[in-house]
Amino acid sequence: MGTNGVRVFVILYLLAVCGCIEYDVDDNVHICTHTNVSHINHTSWYYNDKVIALATEDKTSGYISSFIKRVNISLTCLNISSLRYEDSGTYKGVSHLKDGVIVTTTMNISVKANIIDLTGRVRYLTRNYCEVKIRCEITSFALNGSTTPPHMILGTVDKWKYLPFPTDDYRYVGELKRYISGNPYPTESLALEISSTFNRFTIVKNLNDDEFSCYLFSQNYSFHKMLNVRNICESEWEALNNNNDNSSSMPASHNNLANDLSSMMSQLQNDNDDNNDYSAPMNVDNLIMIVLITMLSIILVIIVVIAAISMYKRSKYRHIDN
């Protein structure tokens, strides 16, 4: 091997950076070489041995489509923002120096696949009563060497739901060696929902009744997320009290005026509703009655007139006979 070949080998060995780092979804990652930028002629960046881009002193070209909006590439650095599950893999930058030396920088990135989204939404609220729907959704998970499908549990110690996950229905990403939610798996199949009710003045004897947990567990691993649902109700009750306090702090005249207006509007609404419900049939009935009465009146008048004429003629004839 020539001197230059040995030199390149030594530099590749000493300057190669290989780190296996785990990131969360939406994290930002920076992969940089420590070589002076003035010594670099051009750098080729790779993702799982596929070229991402070629960076030169003048420009950078060749971004792959999935990275266009989330990546910033230069001669010395590869910066990725808003990491996704599918971004996991091996990244490598091969810098060609102006003196012919090649410097390689490599980093293995693993984006956490086990993602639990646990939320609570108030469905019904009064001064003393609160009903919350708790929803747990698994957006992604990894088998981590397990040979059995994972299972999901949502609830408290005394109240829970159970769901086995058929991994065959998930979208499997071979490069990541993990299952990710998405086509063709229905979104609603990835979640469990449970409802719980709370009374504001009930004394809490067991805090576990307020803590809801969502577990995902398999053969050799498990992880979970917790949510205090009663705290959600407490926040809503406090907001309700604040609104009532603001209303009660208004001057009495304003309250009376508001009440009067409210009563008037309610009465008008009730009257309108009554009119809408009954005015049409009542008008038709009245019209029919009026027509019948009018006809009977006319007939009666005609009968009276005829009778009067007949009586007049009879009296006249009697007078002539006499």
Curated annotation (Swiss-Prot):
Keywords: Glycoprotein, Host cell membrane, Host membrane, Membrane, Signal, Transmembrane, Transmembrane helix
Main location (coarse class): host cell
GO cellular component, one term: membrane
Transmembrane residue ranges: 287-307
InterPro entries: Ig-like_dom_sf, Ig-like_fold, Poxvirus_F5/I6_dom
Glycosylation site residues: 36, 41, 72, 79, 108, 144, 220, 246
Compartments in which it is found: Host cell membrane
Entry annotated with the keyword Membrane: yes
Superkingdom of origin: Viruses
Expression induction or repression: Expressed in the early phase of the viral replicative cycle.
Keyword Electron transport: no
A biological process from GO: viral process
Alphabetized Gene3D superfamilies for the sequence: Immunoglobulins (2.60.40.10)
Membrane topology designation: Single-pass membrane protein
Secretion signal span: 1-20
Family of this protein: Belongs to the orthopoxvirus OPG049 family.
Function statement: Plays a role in the spread of virus to neighboring cells ex vivo.
Protein name per its UniProtKB record: Protein OPG049
Gene name, Swiss-Prot/TrEMBL: OPG049
